Amino acid sequence: MSFSSDTKNELSRIYPEDRESKIAELAAIIRMIGSVSFYGNNKLSLTLSTENASVARLTFKLLKDLFKVAPEVMVRRGKYLKKALTYILFVSDTKAVRDILEETKILNRERGHVKLNYGIDRKIIRTVKMKKAYLRGAFLGGGSISDPEKAYHLEFVTHNLEHGQDLSNLINSFNLNSKVIARKNSYVVYLKEGEQIVDLLNIMGAHNALLNLENVRIYKEMRNNVNRIVNCETANLTKTINASLRQIESINYIKKTVGLDYLPPSLREVAELRVKYPDLSLKELGKMLVPPVGKSGVNHRLRKIEEISNKLKERRVQ
């Protein structure tokens, strides 16, 4: 099961306590997975389709609890490779559908006319609890979250721009920074920052998903830190080895052309130790000198040796 499915299963187990929050959550679910059919004699029907069994069960429970409606339930198997099951809830009673749509503020009556409301009615989200319930319903109906091992991405897919913008504004009312983009015939409201996704999961009540995502974030951060340290140490080691090889080359050139006795005693001592112990650090070489010399002192002497070697090479060229 995917991380997204696990998150939906967790959220679908949260059942709102008060009627207002139930209405808000159901309104969001209908917005995301519902379709309304109008036909002769002012008749209405409502169809809700989802591939998640937990979401179907929750939606059924909300409809029955709030409106005493028991939707007809159908299950269809997909035709393609995965052959996923689709759960369909169908309400055919016109009065029940009208009651549902009017109370969820999807259908408004104005001067005797019925009008669809494509945005989020402010009355549905007038309290913090109702806002959280709406976001939970929107995620259950049309949300998804990427596996945090691969990427940080949470999104809601809606079929109406006005609803997408209202949903983004609702998310951002919690000091988040969601964006809206068009994708084919839909609109996607999304978050891409791990910290903001964690905050939204907390707002919706998906605490297990939140903890799992945080664990992955911490692990990835630790892994990245270790990689940075290893890369830094590797770079430093490469730099040290290259410097040692360069120093030994200079010492051997002096030895071959004029002999190490050409060097002052302090430089000759360092030269002999460097050739004998090519893997030692400057600090370790310094401790072996009599008297001991610090890292900067050893570095200074080795630089002097390289300068002498370079001058000898220049003379030879001349």
From Swiss-Prot:
Asked if the Swiss-Prot or TrEMBL record annotates the protein with the keyword Cell division, the reply is: yes
A single GO molecular-function term is: DNA binding
Question: Which NCBIfam families does the record associate with it?
Answer: DNA_bind_WhiA
Q: Which organism is it from?
A: Caldanaerobacter subterraneus subsp. tengcongensis (strain DSM 15242 / JCM 11007 / NBRC 100824 / MB4) (Thermoanaerobacter tengcongensis)
* Annotated protein name in UniProt: Probable cell division protein WhiA
Q: Which UniProt keywords apply?
A: Cell cycle, Cell division, DNA-binding
State the encoding gene. whiA
One GO BP: cell division
Q: Which domain of life is it from?
A: Bacteria
Membership in a protein family: Belongs to the WhiA family.
**From which residue to which does the signal peptide run?**
none
Known function: Involved in cell division and chromosome segregation.
- Return the annotated DNA-binding positions: 281-314
